[in-house]
């Protein structure tokens, strides 16, 4: 399929990035998390508009709930995590793909990492201390579960020696911490910073210690979007990567843009306090769009070992970097 | 001239595997303009007979013929025991109900309704709903509705049973007044011998289940009648005691079963 | 059981004072940290948040959007429910056909219906309204059918005796006669419509009171979440009163 | 309106045939892909899945756990609801005190209550039961109060005339007299308890029918999710029948 | 010996800002063992007077004294118009209700209940619930309950109003039979002059609102009485017509208002 689209592209390569003749609408499913930075910035800075693309956000409770919408063609692009359900739905013939990075941890300041309850922060200081504790994780057989598993492996603690508490919502973890129902939780920004400020929990070491290349979130593309609307998709990706690069400039390279990116982020996410944005561990976003393919495969193996995967699938068709590559051909590669 | 002719009528109800024989071999002729009262012990089939005449029930065997003299008039209208007044219609709408159902001209409906509201003395209460009326007023509405519909015959099923004795008498008088004007054929069910004596030209007495006509008494007292006259008349007292005795023996027969 | 004149204002006093009492208790508990103020922010703080949100302007947009969804979704559920309910009440074959279907679908939680709704109706406004409509449908249909079935037989006899045709029977007897019970069902449906808005606004919404509640909870902005809860509670109360008033207008004969 | 002997089996036939008709329609639509079989797996497939899950054994555990939660949570809601409802019905000051509180809390969706329940009651079995209990509480309390308030005045006069003391009044008049309306509320509460199980099992559950539904949905194992829905639907039907039977036993005088 | 003494009794109801004067200056003495019927137009305050005697309502001014001869007996028991039978208790439990409320010994309750069930002919129906009974049977339960309680006086508020004429008479006979045995003091409200003539030693006639006693007639006919005897007796017919006339004029007065 990818070769086919290459041909498509070659036919139009005379003027690859001219705005579309007709305004195209792209619906993006989001859960309001910070990892959607690329979308938000590209929208507010007019990168999508430049290509005559109109984007619309649809918010869902979590990424699993987006899948049927992507499959049904209700949305074109979604932010999602790798999970057993994702692989299962592909096995069911729902042809969704990972098309770009939408979140990995930056070394030493992970945006998705364990936190320890405030009153236990002096008791649980190192990995071996997690033995016998109650640990809240937001999904089973998804990236959370995988990172949890990596952490335990790193700590040399078996799964039987801790209590796994499934908690459907990150907000619930805050409540459960406050109520002393759990000891540790795999929490996400900006709730990590917020909880630290409210003395609910503290960061517990860092996820990059044991899962440095964990691919946490990815951009998903609907099959229809990737094939039938290829010309829209390429422009969309180019705009998205430009948004991600602006984000990278501000948060990683510390280039000052007079707070424009931060105000966009505050506007689109639940973290409204612009000053806090300087404190939080921001989501890592690859300015070149590539994802950690090996890690995704590792996660897949993990789910499979857990018996959560039904049916076999061809891994090559799941990760589709052709769109990123096409876009990079046109906008060039970002230099660190 | 016979207005209602009932021949060899019988009615059976099926209740699970049991048959209830409600009416048996009723043969009966009622003349045009006659006011006939039907008396009988409870459960003897009076209501069933009336419902058959009203076409709300089908006879099991036998025939019922109502002589229609005017094709434009409805055959019969019924005055129900109580609660026959529709609670979500106003007094006026209730009285107009039969006419409205026949889709007559608005002017005509209005005029008829007005006339009968006046007759039963409810003009002032036309906009009220039945819940705001006393029991007697409700039955007035029911009677006005039936008369306004101007049917060939009127069927009344214990219309005054739920009223207290004094109100009952007032309504009886009113009914007689309207009836005297229109001279409709009326079949009237009651449990009260006094009521029957006051109102009717003829009293039919029914036996306990299965209902048969066991007595047919003509009441020849002059009209207009009044309770005082009925009570003071020794002839009437004789008829009363006569019917009383027979009724009592029918009732006791029911109780023994 | 005795009523005296001077005591007649006491009940009103109690009625007003009980929520105030509750609020005061909450305020004090929260202020003195008897209740964890991180999770139970003081009512005064919630009120301040409410005012801030109202001033920033988009609170009214959330309210407007949710009310539109609730009202249209409600209508979308109530209208077919009344039609089917009336048919079920009037024709026994309809009743026998529909009642098992209703019995089967009624116990299925709205939350569990969301994926199916999403697949069938997408993520637009319509799917949110459908979510509300489905949850409203059942109580209204059942009550309407019960309303018709419970019309006193004597009125059916009256209608028949006065030769009402099918149309007159429907408009003069079946519809008004079933109205009181039907309105009970609608009152229930209204309550359920509000209960469902949070679930409905979990699929692809970007605004609305339900969205406000769960988005703010996800972000752990509890005062804002409580503002959403208070709004729901307020509208629940408001709609109840509205429907009661409506009922009194519609049923002058009760 | 006429009943003949030979037609009496027809209604039953229709009642049985309508769900079968629906299932057949679904099966055909799914088999011939008129409905997307990825989202609407054929009933036969769901049935096979059900059997497989039953054979693997832990289906019964899920059922057992959910039923325990539903029944205990139901009891936990019904008992205080009846007590408060009776007090509200009998003493007007109670009524005036509690009714605004009930009016305020009733419209708040269970889903939105989850965080608060979690904070107050943690993540154990108890919090799941409380979730169910809260949702059951309101209709039962309201109906109980209405039941007492609607007892015909004449029975109160009879009790007074025959010098019933407070205890006798309660057990011989107030309680049995309010029972029919109270049981209506309990029937509603039962329906709501089932509707709430999915929400309740969203807080820290690792088993139960609700967990089965949303976990399998999250894992995109739709046939398994449908098994969960069918179970809920079945138990909804079953409990309704059970309560109806119970009602007939409890109200021989109705 | 006077059993009930009512002095200068009056009763006003407050309805919004309006006063309704239900009873005015009632002074009355009823002797031990007397059967007194109270007649009067609808709304004249009969029920109100009975409720005051039953302590279900407080008088506005004036006094009511019931002479208690036996401290162990309850002062009064009431038979209500209809629906007074508690639907969730069986026939037996309903009859035993008053005794149970007084927490008497089980054996005693059982024996009394048994006795009065027998008396009213309901032994066979003891386990039935009221919904399964006819109107007449329900009133029998109500009467048995009141008598079983063995009060000093019995208060009856139109107990037979809802029954049909034949059933009414059967119950009247039964009531008289039980009464003759116990010779309780009875205050009985009715709208039916015939009923009053048949039952009472004394008829009190009340005026339209505000209720005053305007006539006090002793009925001296020998007991046992029967409808036939009452109807055939010219003396009785005279009393009937007399009361009728007065009642009619009171009723008409109400209607004019
Ligand atoms: N629809 C029915 N199905 C079965 N039995 C019926 C039905 N209608 C009446 N019956 C029976 O037929 C008999 C006669 O009933 P009907 O109502 O005609 O008596 P009635 O003379 O009007 O009595 P009442 O004086 O009490 O009104 C009764 O035994 C009754 O139980
Ligand atoms: N609780 C009350 N509050 C206000 N007014 C009342 C109350 N009870 C009775 N009344 C009024 O007092 C008057 C007498 O009523 P009561 O019931 O005693 O009449 P009654 O003689 O028993 O009439 P009926 O023969 O119709 O039973 C009526 O005008 C009635 O409206
Ligand atoms: Mg009858
Ligand atoms: Mg009275």
Regions inferred by a protein language model and the residue ranges of each:
Chain B
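Short helical segment in ABC ATPase nucleotide-binding domains corresponding to the A-loop/adjacent helical element
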Residues: 92-100, 110, 114, 218
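Catalytic Walker B motif of ABC-type/P-loop ATPase nucleotide-binding domains
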Residues: 154-157
């Amino acid at each position: 399929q990818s070769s086919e689209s290459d041909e498509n592209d070659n036919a139009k390569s005379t003027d690859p990035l001219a705005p579309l003749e007709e305004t195209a609408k792209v619906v993006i499913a989001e859960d309001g998390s910070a990892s959607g930075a690329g979308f938000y910035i590209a929208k507010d800075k007019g990168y999508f508009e430049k290509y005559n693309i109109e984007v619309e956000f649809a918010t869902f409770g979590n990424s699993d709930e987006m899948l049927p919408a992507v499959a049904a063609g209700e949305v074109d692009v979604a932010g999602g995590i790798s999970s057993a359900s994702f692989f299962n739905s592909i096995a069911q013939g729902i042809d969704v793909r990972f098309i770009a990075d939408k979140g990995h941890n930056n070394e030493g300041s992970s945006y998705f990492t364990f936190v320890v309850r405030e009153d236990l922060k002096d008791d649980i200081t190192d990995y071996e201390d997690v033995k016998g504790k109650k640990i809240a994780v937001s999904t089973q057989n998804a990236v959370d579960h995988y990172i949890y598993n990596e952490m335990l492996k790193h700590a040399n603690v078996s799964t039987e020696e801790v209590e796994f508490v499934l908690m459907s919502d990150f907000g619930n973890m805050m409540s459960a911490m406050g109520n002393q129902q759990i000891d540790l939780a795999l929490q996400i920004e900006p709730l990590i910073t917020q909880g630290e400020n409210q003395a609910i929990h503290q960061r517990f070491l860092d996820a990059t210690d044991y899962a440095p290349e964990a691919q946490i979130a990815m951009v998903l593309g609907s099959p229809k979007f990737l094939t039938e609307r290829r010309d829209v998709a390429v422009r969309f990706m180019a705009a998205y990567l430009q948004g991600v690069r602006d984000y990278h400039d501000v948060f990683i390279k510390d280039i000052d843009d007079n707070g424009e990116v931060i105000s966009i982020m505050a506007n689109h996410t639940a973290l409204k306090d612009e000053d806090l944005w300087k404190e939080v561990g921001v989501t890592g976003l690859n300015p070149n769009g590539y994802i950690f393919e090996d890690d995704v495969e590792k996660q897949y193996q993990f789910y499979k070992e857990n018996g959560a995967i039904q049916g076999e699938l061809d891994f090559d068709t799941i990760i589709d970097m052709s769109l990123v590559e096409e876009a990079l051909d046109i906008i060039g590669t970002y230099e660190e | 001239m016979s207005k209602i002719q009932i021949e060899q009528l019988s009615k059976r109800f099926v209740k699970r595997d049991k048959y209830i024989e409600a009416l048996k071999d009723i043969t009966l002729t009622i003349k045009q303009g006659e006011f006939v009262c039907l008396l009988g012990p409870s459960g003897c089939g009076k209501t069933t007979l009336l419902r058959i005449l009203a076409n709300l029930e089908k006879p099991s065997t036998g025939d019922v013929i109502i002589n229609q003299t005017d094709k434009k008039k409805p055959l019969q209208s019924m005055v129900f025991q109580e609660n026959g007044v529709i609670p979500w219609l106003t007094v006026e709408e209730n009285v107009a109900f039969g006419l409205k159902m026949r889709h007559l001209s608005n002017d005509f409906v209005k005029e008829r309704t007005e006339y009968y509201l006046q007759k039963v003395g409810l003009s002032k209460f036309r906009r009220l709903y039945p819940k705001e009326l006393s029991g007697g007023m409700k039955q007035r509405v029911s009677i006005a509705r039936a008369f306004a519909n101007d049917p060939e015959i009127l069927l009344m099923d214990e219309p005054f049973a739920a009223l207290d004795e004094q109100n009952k008498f007032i309504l009886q008088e009113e009914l007689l007044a309207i009836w005297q004007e229109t001279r409709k054929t009326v079949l009237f069910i009651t449990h009260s011998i006094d009521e029957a004596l006051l109102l009717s030209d003829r009293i039919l007495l029914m036996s306990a289940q299965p209902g048969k006509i066991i007595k047919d008494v003509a009441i020849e007292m002059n009209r207009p009648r009044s309770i005082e006259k009925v009570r003071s008349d020794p002839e009437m007292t004789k008829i009363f005691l006569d019917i009383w005795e027979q009724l009592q023996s029918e009732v006791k027969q029911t109780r023994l079963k | 059981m005795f009523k005296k004149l001077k005591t007649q204002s006491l009940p009103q006093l109690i009625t007003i004072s009980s929520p105030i009492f509750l609020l005061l208790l909450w305020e004090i508990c929260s202020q003195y940290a008897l209740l964890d103020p991180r999770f139970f922010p003081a009512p005064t703080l919630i009120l301040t948040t409410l005012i801030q949100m109202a001033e920033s302007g988009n609170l009214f947009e959330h309210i407007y959007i949710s009310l539109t969804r609730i009202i249209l979704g409600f209508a979308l559920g109530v209208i077919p429910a009344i039609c089917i309910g009336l048919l079920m009440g009037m024709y026994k074959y309809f009743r026998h056909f529909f009642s098992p279907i209703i019995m089967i679908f009624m116990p299925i939680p709205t939350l569990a219906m969301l994926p199916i709704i999403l697949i069938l109706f997408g993520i637009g406004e319509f799917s949110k309204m459908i979510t509300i409509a489905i949850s409203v449908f059942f109580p209204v249909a059942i009550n309407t059918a019960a309303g018709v079935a419970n019309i006193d037989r004597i009125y059916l006899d009256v209608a028949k005796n006065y030769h009402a045709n099918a149309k007159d029977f429907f408009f003069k007897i079946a519809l008004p006669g079933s109205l009181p019970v039907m309105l009970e069902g609608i009152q229930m449906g209204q309550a359920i419509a509000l209960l469902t808005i949070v679930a409905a606004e979990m699929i692809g919404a970007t605004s609305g009171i339900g969205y406000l509640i769960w988005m703010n909870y996800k972000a752990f902005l509890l005062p804002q979440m409580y503002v959403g809860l208070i709004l729901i509670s307020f509208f629940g109360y408001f709609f109840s009163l509205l429907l009661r008033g409506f009922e009194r207008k519609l049923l002058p004969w009760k």
